[in-house]
Amino acid sequence: MKTVHYKYDRIPYLIIFTDPTPFKDTYAGEMGKTVLKSHLIKPQGAESDTVIVFMHPIGGGEYLPMPTALVKAGHHVIYCQSRYPNNDTALVMEKVVVDMGACIRDAKERLGYKKVVLAGWSGGGSLSALYQSQAENPTITETPAGEPPSLIDANLIPA
């Protein structure tokens, strides 16, 4: 059986959403808004209603081997960076869960994907598991430091 390797298109885009947090814990940007850098990577000539979403708590991974290999095999992939793109030591994991929720909502509502499959590379694996658990049964009301966000109030949608 011959293996097909699709050529693909990489479409960078931004996800911008309202974030009611009373302070800005990253370096720049409009107060009350969060901006996530994302890449939609689609194989040419392979339509799909399913997309595989990758996110890592810190740093970018849109050029890692796994997302690229999946696209070359015919799968649609989104790599979405969190609000902590530069190995930021200010990371608050609960906020990254909110970021992943914004990416999943955008994939379903704006991009039109019916199914979202969560995938993870390193810290992205634990992030994906935490996200899905909180989307299905939210229990986290604040960070360990007693600060927002509450994932109960985040209106996360399951992947």
Question: Where does each model-flagged region fall?
Answer:
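N-terminal cap/lid segment of alpha/beta-hydrolase-fold proteins
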Residues: 1-50
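A generic membrane alpha-helix/interface feature
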Residues: 74, 92, 99, 138-142, ...
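Short, surface-exposed basic-aromatic patches at helix termini and helix-loop junctions that form
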Residues: 68-76, 98-101, 105-110, 133-137
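Primarily recognizes the serine-hydrolase "nucleophile elbow" in alpha/beta-hydrolase
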Residues: 106-109, 114-159
